C-alpha cells in the first residue's frame, strides 16, 4: 500500500508527466536537428527525441536514435500516451541500436558530437522507464473500455464449398439463417 508521502510523490510525478505530454500539442514541430540537455529528462535530441518535442510530418530523422523516437511518436499519436506497448517498442528499438553500436566497435556516435549516443541513450531510456511507469498508473486510473461486440460476417455458403463444422475457423458454430446463409462473429470470445 502506498503511504501519504509516497502517494504525494506519485501524484506529483504523474501530473508533471501528463502536463509535459500535453505540451506536445502546443509546440511547433521541428525541422532542425538539435542536441540540448542531453543528460537530463528535458532532453531535446534530433527532431523527435524528448517529451513534448516532435518533428514535422515528412521530416527525416537525424540518426538511428531519432528514428526510434519518430517511430515512438507515431505510435503514441495513434494509440495514446498511456499505451505501454509504444514505450516498450521504443526500448526494443534502442536496444537494437545499442547492439549495432557495440558491433561497430563504438564507431556509431549519432549526429551530434556534443551529445554522443553514450550520453543520450541512457537518458532517453531512463525517460521511457518513467513513461512506462506513469502509463501503468494512468491505465489504472482510467480503465480501458470493455470491448463491444464486433461486426458479423454473413456468407451465402451455397456458392462456396466452405467447411462450416468449426465455425469457419472461429471455433464458434455458425448461426444458420435463410437456408444456406450463415453468420459468424468476427471477434469471438476466447474459448
From Swiss-Prot:
It catalyses: a 1,2-diacyl-sn-glycero-3-phosphocholine + H2O = a 1-acyl-sn-glycero-3-phosphocholine + a fatty acid + H(+). InterPro entries: PLipase_A2_dom_sf, PLipase_A2_His_AS. It is found in: Secreted; Endoplasmic reticulum. One of its GO terms (biological process) is arachidonate secretion. Ca(2+) binds at residues 48, 50, 53, 73. It is an enzyme of class 3 (hydrolase). Keywords: Calcium, Disulfide bond, Endoplasmic reticulum, Hydrolase, Lipid degradation, Lipid metabolism, Metal-binding, Secreted, Signal. Disulfide bonds join 29-56, 33-62, 38-115, 49-69, 68-93, 75-86. Its main location: secreted. Residues 1-25 form the signal peptide. Binds 1 Ca(2+) ion per subunit. It comes from the Eukaryota. Its EC number is 3.1.1.4. One of its GO terms (molecular function) is phospholipase A2 activity. Residues 161-191 are annotated as: Disordered. Its cofactor is Ca(2+). Specifically expressed in flowers but at a low level. Detected specifically in the pollen. The active site is at 72. Gene3D superfamilies: Phospholipase A2 domain. GO terms for cellular component: endoplasmic reticulum; extracellular region. Belongs to the phospholipase A2 family. PA2 catalyzes the calcium-dependent hydrolysis of the 2-acyl groups in 3-sn-phosphoglycerides. Releases lysophospholipids (LPLs) and free fatty acids (FFAs) from membrane phospholipids in response to hormones and other external stimuli. Plays a role in pollen development and germination and tube growth. The enzyme has a slight preference for phosphatidylethanolamine over phosphatidylcholine. This is Phospholipase A2-delta. It comes from Arabidopsis thaliana (Mouse-ear cress). The lineage of its organism: Eukaryota, Viridiplantae, Streptophyta, Embryophyta, Tracheophyta. The gene is PLA2-DELTA.
